[in-house]
């Protein structure tokens, strides 16, 4: 009762509403050990609870046995193919919900109000207590509009949007231009809270952190903001913002050099002795002998230090390494957990055995601790270059690839996608979108600021001496002066017409144009562009560090549902969705318009300014005038192209690989320099219920697939969209990449941005509900599908050469010269070859294709997968020899077995469907084609080819092949010729 808000209590009492509670999540967790089902099955508990408390059963005279029989029959229809155990577990959850639903006791309306479900955070002195805050201000950004920037139009203001969509109108939502035009303010998810959406939350253990950045790279929800700081900065931030007494604040600040020195000494001792002493304990010890200020102030200072998550013990690149090279230079590293977290636990899984993050139950006290931490973070400066190692914040392209994760230590990059949206917990798409946004911000923002400084300087030079320079030009070369004035009037002052005659008329109507007018026009445009690129506040309340560096055009799909459903969208930049298939062409239009604006507002004004300032007396010809008045990207330098705002086309494998494929193909062929595309490859129509796409594996596996005697899934080879752009599409930059390898992923994005042409990235993205995996598995599944050759990594960079061998890079795939990657079972050390069958065994969507064999004595009647794969090629499948019992390539349905890692890591034997074996063959063939393009000689392919030539010619009998396939294969492999036999 105390957790219900006053308005709800009032309505409950007035309307005599009965209120019930149900421990649905607890019930579901006890019913299954599958993490992906433990939260989702609570819906079955609600089903039972609903029928228990509603009058339906009583009104229709249905007893409990009849009710359970009806429900069981429905479960039989839905889950019967999965076996009786699945039906019984669902029945157990339902009946538990029926029996455990409890009516709460209605209390007094004046009872204590704990409806926020939150504890009280420790806030800085500048922040008012929650009770004194205006509605919505507790989480709002506080940066004012910069001087010289006009107020935004109402349709783009977050406040106006919130007044309509965050004001509890419900079904009484008023009609407005926002709704009529389907317009949202940008980045509204920034002020959202996911507190009620998560059951558990990650807890940061600083003493175990190594600053590997893996957790931060995989987090889909911008929920792990982080930074590195000098020790002194942390100490002074705590003193200046949390110690109330002004006098004591000054005294403590005077002691900071001594506190910092003592703390650093203790830190060095702890690191040298490999101790895990927490940072707050060291600060407490360092201040223990200091006096001259009150105990209250000491307590206030130490209290916030205890709440601030500070790591030093194992963050060698931040503390130990710098300290060793230059004593006194080591810093500290912090990870904060924000209220945007959905509790997916992807970060905890990525952290793994480091144990620097642990999932804990979300409680009022844990929430208060996290809110305290993020409030402290907002007071800290951004991470300095000295803590970023070989990541170059001013020139990210020059960074070492292994350090590219460090770009996420810079807050302006980290906040490039704000999250707060309604994407599923752990959504693999979000991790990719966040990387796209953060890398683009990291790449473009320094270019913008350098451009702004350059423009500001040139505008100043024009203001100071431009008129005199024009007068000198008129005296020396009157024709060039006249042509220069005409060019500025035409391109900058808006007096150009559709033809020479039209322009002449416009100029005559305007009247005389003085040299002062020309200089003022050029300088004004340069000054405005300088402001726009460095000082403009693009979004309400956010940093005033320049206009957006990118825009996004989206194909309809999951990304547009969570990307544009009021009230929370994650995009702090221009974003548009039109139709399912036309995101690519919309993005192309964006790119063209950006190039026109860039030419008119930046390139042409700067070039004309340079002509006047640096090239006085050089010829200004009629051809120059023509070029300026018919300007295009063909005339831009590489540097001018880099400074172009970028466009990212985004969509799923359905929108971009199926129905919208022709649009994407068209855009790739144009090779526009600022248009890039990323396909979020969930391998299924995730948003519309699980239909197959061309990118869906041969197994199908989605909700819309049938499995039985007539069909075992999709049955068609997988289309890898990225591979189709390696030929016949001009010269685009192409990559198939994912968060499986974050540094290489970030590098591919950077190289795509650098490339003067269209870029395309195909990124495998886990869809937890459609793939049947737990919320924390996006990283693991991306690695598994890569390692299995299901979605191998590659980068095709045309700048490297005009042959596939030069331009195509397969680095990052394990054992890239082999058919399959060889690994070991963790529990036994036994080696095995990791095929797509092994990846499929980890996703519930493929469960129909694998049957567990508990009695391993039965495998004597089955064929090992290794043996079977030696017997068969893709051409055997094309000719349907796999269906001929007399042929060497015959694949018996569930007559092939493999050992796969079980849930406990131990090997377990499974029989494979015929379709799964064919999927292995198909993926091997696709991988071999990639290898050949990259110039990699696969001796295993040669060995298999030579062996099968001998079998088909009768030199080796079919019986011997069946009995000794692996042995014969190894013999051929050891003596493998250098070329494939004809």
Predicted segments — roles?
Residues 1-140, 567, 691-692, 701-708, ...:
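Active-site cofactor/cluster-binding pocket
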Residues 137-160, 186, 196-225, 233-237, ...:
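Flexible, low-complexity linker and terminal segments
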Residues 1-13, 370-400, 572-574, 693-718, ...:
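Acidic, Ser/Thr-rich peripheral helices and adjacent loops at domain boundaries
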Residues 16-19, 410-411, 415, 604, ...:
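Conserved thiamine diphosphate
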Residues 101, 214-218, 430-435, 535-538, ...:
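Thiamine diphosphate
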Residues 83-335, 340, 348-568, 572-638, ...:
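Ferredoxin-type iron-sulfur electron-transfer modules and their immediate structural context
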Residues 1-2, 555, 676-681:
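Short internal beta-strands
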């Amino acid at each position: 009762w105390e957790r219900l808000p006053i308005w709800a209590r009032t309505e409950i009492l007035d309307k005599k509403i009965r209120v019930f509670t149900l421990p649905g999540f607890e019930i579901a967790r006890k019913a299954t050990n599958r993490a992906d089902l433990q939260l989702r099955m609570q819906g079955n508990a609600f089903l039972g609870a609903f029928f228990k408390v509603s009058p339906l059963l009583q009104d229709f005279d249905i007893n409990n046995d009849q009710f359970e029989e009806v429900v069981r029959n429905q479960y039989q229809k839905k889950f019967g193919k999965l076996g009786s155990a699945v039906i019984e577990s669902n029945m157990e959850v339902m009946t538990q919900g029926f029996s455990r639903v409890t009516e709460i006791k209605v209390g007094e309306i004046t009872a204590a109000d704990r409806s926020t479900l939150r504890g009280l955070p420790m806030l800085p002195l500048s922040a008012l207590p929650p009770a004194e805050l205006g509605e919505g201000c507790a989480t709002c950004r506080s940066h004012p509009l910069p001087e010289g920037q006009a107020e935004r139009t109402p349709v783009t203001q977050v406040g106006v949007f919130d007044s309509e969509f965050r004001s509890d109108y419900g079904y009484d939502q008023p009609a407005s231009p926002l709704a009529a035009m389907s317009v949202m303010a940008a980045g509204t998810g920034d002020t959202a809270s996911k507190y009620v959406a998560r059951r558990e939350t990650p807890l940061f253990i600083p003493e175990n952190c190594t600053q590997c950045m893996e957790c931060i790279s995989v987090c889909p929800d911008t929920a792990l903001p982080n930074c590195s700081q000098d020790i002194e900065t942390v100490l002074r931030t705590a003193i200046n913002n949390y110690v109330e007494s002004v006098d004591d604040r000054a005294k403590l600040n005077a002691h900071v050099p001594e506190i910092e020195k003592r703390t650093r000494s203790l830190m060095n001792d702890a690191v040298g002795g490999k101790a895990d002493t927490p940072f707050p304990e060291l600060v407490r010890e360092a201040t223990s002998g200091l006096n001259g200020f009150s105990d209250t102030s000491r307590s206030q200072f130490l209290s916030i230090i205890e709440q601030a998550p500070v790591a030093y013990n194992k963050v060698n690149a931040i503390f130990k390494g710098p300290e060793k090279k230059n004593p006194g230079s080591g810093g500290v590293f912090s990870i904060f957990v924000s209220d945007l977290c959905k509790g997916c636990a992807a970060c905890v899984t990525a952290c793994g055995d480091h144990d620097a993050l642990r999932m804990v139950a979300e409680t009022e006290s844990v929430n208060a601790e996290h809110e305290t931490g993020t409030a402290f973070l907002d007071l800290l400066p951004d991470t300095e270059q000295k803590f970023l190692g070989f990541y170059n914040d001013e020139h990210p392209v020059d960074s070492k690839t292994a350090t590219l994760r460090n770009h996420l230590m810079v807050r302006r990059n980290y906040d490039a996608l704000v999250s707060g949206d309604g994407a599923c917990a752990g959504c693999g798409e979000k991790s990719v979108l966040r990387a796209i946004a953060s890398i683009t911000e990291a790449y473009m923002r320094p270019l913008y600021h350098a451009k702004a400084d350059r423009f500001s300087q040139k505008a100043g030079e024009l203001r100071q001496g431009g008129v005199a320079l024009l007068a000198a030009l008129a005296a020396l070369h009157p024709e060039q002066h006249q042509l220069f004035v005409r060019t500025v009037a035409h391109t900058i002052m808006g007096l150009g017409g559709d033809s020479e005659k039209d322009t002449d008329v416009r100029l005559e109507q305007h009247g005389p144009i003085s040299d002062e007018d020309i200089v003022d026009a050029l300088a004004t445009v340069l000054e405005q562009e300088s402001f726009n690129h460095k000082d403009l506040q693009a979004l309400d309340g956010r940093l005033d560090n320049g206009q957006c560096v990118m825009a996004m055009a989206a194909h309809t799909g999951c990304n547009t549902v969570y990307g544009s459903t009021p009230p929370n969208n994650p995009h702090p930049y221009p974003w548009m969705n039109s139709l399912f298939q036309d995101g690519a062409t919309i993005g192309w239009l964006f790119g063209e318009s950006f190039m026109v604006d860039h030419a008119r507002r930046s390139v042409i004004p700067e070039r004309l300014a340079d002509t006047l300032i640096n090239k006085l007396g050089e010829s200004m010809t009629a051809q120059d005038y023509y070029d300026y008045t018919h300007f295009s990207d063909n005339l831009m330098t590489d540097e001018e192209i880099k400074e172009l705002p970028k466009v990212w086309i985004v969509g799923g494998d359905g929108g971009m690989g199926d129905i919208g494929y022709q649009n994407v193909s068209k855009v790739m062929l144009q090779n526009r320099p600022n248009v890039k595309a990323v396909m979020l490859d969930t391998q299924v129509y995730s948003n519309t219920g699980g239909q197959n796409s061309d990118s869906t594996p041969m197994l199908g596996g989605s909700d819309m697939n049938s499995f039985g005697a007539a069909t075992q899934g999709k049955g068609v080879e997988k289309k890898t969209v990225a591979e189709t752009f390696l030929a016949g599409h001009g010269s685009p930059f192409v990559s198939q990449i994912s968060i499986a390898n974050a540094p290489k992923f970030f590098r591919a994005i950077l190289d795509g941005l650098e490339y003067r042409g269209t870029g395309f990235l195909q990124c495998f993205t886990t869809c937890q509900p459609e793939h049947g995996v737990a919320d924390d598995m996006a990283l693991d599944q991306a690695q598994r599908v890569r390692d299995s050759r299901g979605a191998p990594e590659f980068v095709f960079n045309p700048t490297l050469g005009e042959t596939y061998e030069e331009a195509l890079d397969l680095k990052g795939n394990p054992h890239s010269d082999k058919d399959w990657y060889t690994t070991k079972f963790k529990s036994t050390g036994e080696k095995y070859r990791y095929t797509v069958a092994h990846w499929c065994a980890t996703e519930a969507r493929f469960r129909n294709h694998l049957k567990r064999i508990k009695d391993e004595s039965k495998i004597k009647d089955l064929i090992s997968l290794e043996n079977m794969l030696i017997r068969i090629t893709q051409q055997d499948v094309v000719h349907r020899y796999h269906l001929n019992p007399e042929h060497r390539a015959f694949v018996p349905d569930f007559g092939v077995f493999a050992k796969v890692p079980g849930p406990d890591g131990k090997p377990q034997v499974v029989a494979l469907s015929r379709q799964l074996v064919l999927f292995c063959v198909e993926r091997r063939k696709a991988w071999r084609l990639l290898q050949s393009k990259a110039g990699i000689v696969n001796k295993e392919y040669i060995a298999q080819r030579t062996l099968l030539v001998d079998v088909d010619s009768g030199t080796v009998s079919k019986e011997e092949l069946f009995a000794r396939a692996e042995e014969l294969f190894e013999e051929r492999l050891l003596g493998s010729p250098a070329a494939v036999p004809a």
